[in-house]
């Protein structure tokens, strides 16, 4: 009985998988419209450089090729997010398409130019980006011609590097781009075009965040907390440390924010510095309050030992509070990034 039950479950599982595969294949076939010609498209990225976050753009040098069957020529394309077209270069592989042994037409081109990408900097300096290159056909709408990826994996030069960034791989996809306008041409309706997109995933290395941004700030925080280990009677020395720490934190914030474009929101690092400013100001206020208490009661017996113990406890609580808040901000940033992927 048990063996018969397992065989029945296995049969149901196999039937389910076959049904899902058939449904997926039917859905893919249903996406092709009557009279629509398919162009299999691939990209081989050679170089990507001059990544300019302030201008939201980058330069790319790559090959793009097309394989198709039919009379419609897919070579007359527009790079939708191309900018500075006066410096754009385009060199075709062949003057006329080649006939491949499998019956496909083949041609391509080498492209070099600047492309636009809106950088989302909410998670700076742990930000990740998908740099995209978008193409559409100028002559034919989606119901006549559709671009599809030539293979499951996009191609990138083997020794491809981007200094200051980690490369997370590349993808190609095809989607519909609907223009909800007739561009002023009477009698025409909104038009949809096949939009082919190449995406390169990049991310800043964690070492940039830890060593260049967090380490200097952590040193400033620890130096400011050192004021709570100085004798309560030495008010000038106790105040000078957090004041110096506050000025240093302001200068450190300016050093990285000057390299970012003007955005209307706080990036992750701004939020970390906001926590730092609050902690340093709290240290300074604590030093002032304790100093005033000692000055007022200097003619009386003041339990300085108790004050020093309280200050040291506050120092440890302060560093713990800072670490917990930073970890909370990092967790919120990670959840936000995961929601956008």
Give the label of every model feature segment.
Residues 25-201:
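Soluble non-transmembrane domains of integral membrane proteins
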Residues 328-341:
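Juxtamembrane boundary at the C-terminal end of a transmembrane helix
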Residues 307, 323, 338-340:
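Acidic, carboxylate-rich catalytic segments that either coordinate divalent cations
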Residues 1-10:
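Bacterial N-terminal signal peptides that target proteins for export
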Residues 197-321:
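Channel- or pocket-lining gating/hinge segments that regulate access to a cavity or pore
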């Amino acid at each position: 009985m048990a063996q018969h039950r397992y065989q029945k479950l296995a049969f149901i599982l196999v039937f389910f998988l076959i049904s899902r595969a058939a449904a997926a294949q039917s859905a893919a076939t249903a996406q092709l419209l009557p009279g629509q010609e398919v162009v299999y498209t691939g990209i081989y990225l050679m170089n990507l450089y001059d990544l300019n976050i302030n201008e939201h753009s980058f330069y790319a040098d790559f090959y793009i090729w097309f394989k198709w069957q039919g009379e419609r020529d897919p070579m007359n394309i527009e790079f939708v997010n191309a900018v500075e077209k006066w410096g754009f270069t385009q060199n075709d592989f062949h003057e006329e398409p080649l006939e491949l042994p499998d019956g496909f037409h083949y041609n391509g081109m080498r492209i070099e130019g600047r492309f636009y990408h809106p950088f989302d900097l909410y998670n700076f300096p742990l930000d990740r980006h998908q740099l995209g290159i978008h193409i559409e056909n100028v002559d034919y709408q989606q119901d006549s011609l559709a671009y599809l990826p030539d293979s499951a994996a996009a191609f990138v030069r083997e020794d491809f590097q981007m200094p200051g960034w980690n490369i997370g791989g590349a993808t190609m996809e095809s989607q519909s781009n609907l223009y909800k306008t007739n561009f002023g041409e009477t009698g025409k309706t909104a038009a949809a075009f096949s939009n082919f997109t190449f995406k390169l995933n990049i991310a800043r290395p964690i070492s940039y965040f830890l060593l260049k941004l967090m380490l200097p700030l952590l040193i400033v925080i620890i130096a400011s907390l050192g004021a709570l280990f100085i004798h309560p009677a030495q008010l000038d020395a106790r105040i000078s440390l957090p004041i110096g720490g506050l000025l240093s934190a302001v200068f450190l914030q300016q050093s990285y924010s000057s390299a970012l474009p003007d955005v209307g929101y706080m990036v992750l690092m701004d939020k970390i510095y906001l926590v730092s400013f609050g902690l340093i100001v709290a240290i300074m206020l604590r030093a002032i309050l304790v100093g005033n208490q000692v000055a007022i009661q200097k003619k009386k017996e003041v339990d300085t030992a108790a004050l020093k113990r309280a200050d040291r406890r506050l120092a440890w609580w302060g560093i713990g509070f800072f670490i917990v808040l930073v970890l909370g901000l990092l967790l919120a940033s990670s959840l936000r990034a995961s929601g956008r992927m």
